[in-house]
């Protein structure tokens, strides 16, 4: 397996990342365990998940993928062998069951802390190596919407710094 530095960190990640979004919906916990075992045995040390998973997102499977990964960490005692990436969900129609509801989702400090704390609990770990914004909170030119309006009051990055460094 080939490895690369993750950005400017000292973390060496495999060039192949295991995507886990189907664990808990299309794949059972045992399927997930088998896939993670297989990947790790072949040198894949980079796993990607999100609070929103399993896909297709539904209330009944919300956070299920992170729970399966957490169960695997607990059973295999191998958290230190994995570079783990997860993501926070943001405003999106149909996500009323995440935190306080889709209209209140965002990248503010309250939401970010709540999302991280819940992910850590599901993942049965005390750290996430790479934490990402899953979907932009701002309007983006997607699905035929071509206009982008810059919002100079957007403080997402400031919030991320506050959460990370406090």
PLM feature spans:
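N-terminal small/glycine-rich loop or linker at the start of catalytic domains
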Residues: 7-26, 85-103, 132-135, 139-141
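Charge-rich, low-complexity amphipathic helices
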Residues: 35, 54, 61-62, 91, ...
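Intrinsically disordered, low-complexity sequence elements enriched in Ser/Thr/Gly/Pro
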Residues: 2-3, 85, 120, 130
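Glycine/proline-rich, positively charged
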Residues: 96-166
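A short linear-motif detector with a strong N-terminal bias
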Residues: 61-65, 93, 109-112
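N-terminal binding-site loop/beta-alpha segment at the start of enzyme catalytic domains
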Residues: 1-83, 126, 155
């Amino acid at each position: 397996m080939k490895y690369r530095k993750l950005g400017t960190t000292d973390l060496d990640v495999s060039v192949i990342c295991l995507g886990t979004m189907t664990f808990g919906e299309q794949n059972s916990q045992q399927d997930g365990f088998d896939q993670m075992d297989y990947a790790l045995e072949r040198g894949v040390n980079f796993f990607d998940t999100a609070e929103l998973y399993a896909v297709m997102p539904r209330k009944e499977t919300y956070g299920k993928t992170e729970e399966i990964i957490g169960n695997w960490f607990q059973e295999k005692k191998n958290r230190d062998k994995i570079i783990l990436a997860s993501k926070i969900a943001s405003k999106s129609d149909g996500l009323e069951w995440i935190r306080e509801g889709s209209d209140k989702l965002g990248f503010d400090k309250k939401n970010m802390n709540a999302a991280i704390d819940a992910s850590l609990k599901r993942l049965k770990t005390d750290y996430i190596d790479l934490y990402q914004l899953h979907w932009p909170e701002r309007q983006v030119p997607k699905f035929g919407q071509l206009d982008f309006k810059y919002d100079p009051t957007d403080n997402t990055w400031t919030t991320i710094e506050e959460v990370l460094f406090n």
